[in-house]
UniProtKB/Swiss-Prot annotation:
Pfam families cross-referenced by the UniProt entry: Intron_maturas2 (PF01348), MatK_N (PF01824)
Protein name: Maturase K
Provenance organism: Beaucarnea recurvata
GO biological processes: mRNA processing; RNA splicing; tRNA processing
Family: Belongs to the intron maturase 2 family. MatK subfamily.
The gene coding this protein: matK
């Protein structure tokens, strides 16, 4: 436990005292958008009620100046109380909702500044080139291809929820020693909860956030997940023979945050002393790997089934004792990798076993040696994608293409552009699939849906419309993967295109998941 205590207290200088003076200064506008922050991977444009970036940021700057004005807070609280107990007032409700959104944007911008600058300085110190490529969702799949083929068991974890708002504030208290900010954040969360807009409830996952306030709540969610992932980092460091100095994690914004090596958790030591000091031995597995995505996580290991069951048991106790969250057993599924397929970031992933026989000749005797090789395989989940297309009104639940009536008011070029963009994005994202036949079916549905939409607009049949304009009209807007490959590898096209339906390609420019892919 002395080692754990030192691990927690080694770097207390990382605690932040930044917010108290900044809230009283107008220059936060310039500080939040200096060259270092705009160039970092933390930066995202602020989008507020459809305003452009310049207008919305001006509103953020003005709101920061008004945050501590007494009349503003009294008006905001009175408006929210009137809406709850007196009746619905559209103007007051809109004003309260608008200011709540602006406050959350202000919080998010301010609180990201030190973490962003620290991350940029870290990459400059380590001289890591092209770290923007680490943002790509596809960058995690080569890691899985390299590691999972050597492992035996995988635990599919659904991160527990809900998490109480007060616990979220306490988590930030470990990082930020600014009392006014914590009180202000607590007040805002409670008022926002009273307006029934905060989506941290028992019926909805903490991963699903309000569209209007997603920036702040993503930060709070990442703080919550970072807290319980810290235990994995500590145990991994204790069990690893190499004693790794750092580890990385993909957060929900698909940005690559470098895991902070030291995290100050005051009462975490008490929990570990009372419970985990007898059980740290169970994770002494040098082949344990952890990946988190979309409110879920995968914990894979080369250990035995008994070891993984112990990990599952201690996860439940950790969530219960530390976060006061009751987690049901169904939230962790333990399976053997060779007999299990799991949905992961838009792909149906599994571990394939290839059996082969090798004839060995020794003097006059010959015998066969059976060998087994493992391969990490990713395919397109056709059924799920068809369900997403049906939900978006591109086809029926059985996969029969239908027209998109809501788009018939657009011009022909806009209709073709929309369908073509969706088709190209899906092809680009699922380029890592080992079997492209399912992707061809999705393309066929989109093409025929596009043709039906155009025919409906011109009050004609699909056959008549295509006969008049030619079937090549659609080909221009649906770039095939082979054409993309020929542009990337012009000199090696014949070799690459041979069997291209089986080739897997991972791109380093995919930083978000298409809504049609993100159906989980």
């Amino acid at each position: 436990m002395e080692e754990l205590q030192g691990y927690l207290e080694k770097d207390r200088s990382r605690q932040q005292h930044f917010l108290y003076p900044l809230l009283f200064q107008e220059y936060i506008y310039a500080l939040a958008h200096n060259h270092g922050l705009n160039g970092s991977i933390f930066y995202e444009p602020v989008e507020v009620f459809g305003y452009d970036n310049k207008s919305s940021l001006v509103l953020v700057k003005r709101l920061i100046i008004r945050i501590y004005q007494q009349n503003f807070w009294i008006s905001l609280v009175n408006d929210s109380n009137q809406n709850r107990f007196v009746g619905y007032n559209h103007n007051n409700f809109f004003x309260s909702h608008f200011y709540s959104q602006m406050i959350s944007e202000s919080f998010a911008i301010i609180v990201e500044i030190p973490f962003s600058l620290r991350l940029v300085s870290y990459f400059e110190e380590k001289e890591i080139p092209k770290y923007h490529n680490l943002r790509s969702i596809h960058s995690i799949f080569p890691f899985l291809e390299d590691k999972l083929s050597h492992l035996n068991y995988v635990s599919d974890i659904l991160i527990p929820h809900p998490i109480h708002m007060e616990i979220l504030v306490q988590i930030l208290q470990c990082w930020i020693q600014d009392v006014p900010f914590l009180h202000l954040l607590r007040f805002f969360l409670h008022e926002y909860h009273n307006l029934n807009s905060l989506l941290i409830t028992q019926k909805k996952s903490i991963y699903v956030f309000s569209k209007e306030n997603k920036r702040l709540f993503r930060f709070l969610y990442n703080s919550y997940v970072f807290e319980w992932e810290f235990l994995l980092v500590f145990i991994r460091k204790q069990s690893s023979y190499l004693r790794l100095t750092s580890s990385g994690t993909f957060l929900e914004r698909t940005h690559f945050y470098e895991k902070i090596e030291h995290l100050q958790i005051e009462h975490f030591v008490v929990v570990c002393r009372n419970y985990f000091h007898r059980t740290l031995w169970f994770c002494k597995d040098p082949f344990m790997h952890y990946v988190r995505y979309q409110g879920k996580a995968i914990l894979a290991s080369k250990g035995t089934h008994l070891l993984m069951k112990k990990c599952k048991y201690h996860f439940f106790n950790f969530w219960q004792y530390y976060f006061h969250v009751w987690s049901q057993p169904y939230r962790i599924h333990l399976n053997q990798l060779s007999n299990y397929s799991f949905y992961f970031l838009g792909y149906l992933s599994s571990l394939l076993l290839n059996f082969s026989a090798v004839r060995n000749q020794m003097l006059e005797n010959s015998f066969l040696i059976d060998t087994i090789t493992k391969k990490f395989d990713t395919i397109v989940p056709v059924i799920f994608l068809i369900g997403s297309l049906a939900k978006a009104k591109f086809c029926t639940v059985s996969g029969h293409p239908i027209s998109k009536p809501i788009w018939t008011d657009l011009s022909d070029s806009d209709i073709l552009d929309r369908f073509g963009r969706i088709c190209r994005n899906l092809s680009h994202y699922h380029s890592g699939s080992s079997k492209k036949q399912g992707l061809y079916r999705i393309k066929y549905i989109l093409r025929l849906s596009c043709a039906r939409t155009l025919a409906r607009k011109h009050k004609s049949t699909v056959r008549t419309f295509l006969r008049r304009l030619g079937s090549g009209l659609l080909e221009e807007f649906f770039t095939e993967e082979e054409q993309v490959l020929s542009l990337i590898f012009p000199k090696a096209t014949p070799f690459i295109l041979h069997g291209s339906h089986r080739e897997r390609i991972w791109y380093l420019d995919i930083i978000c998941i298409n809504d049609l892919v993100n159906h989980s």
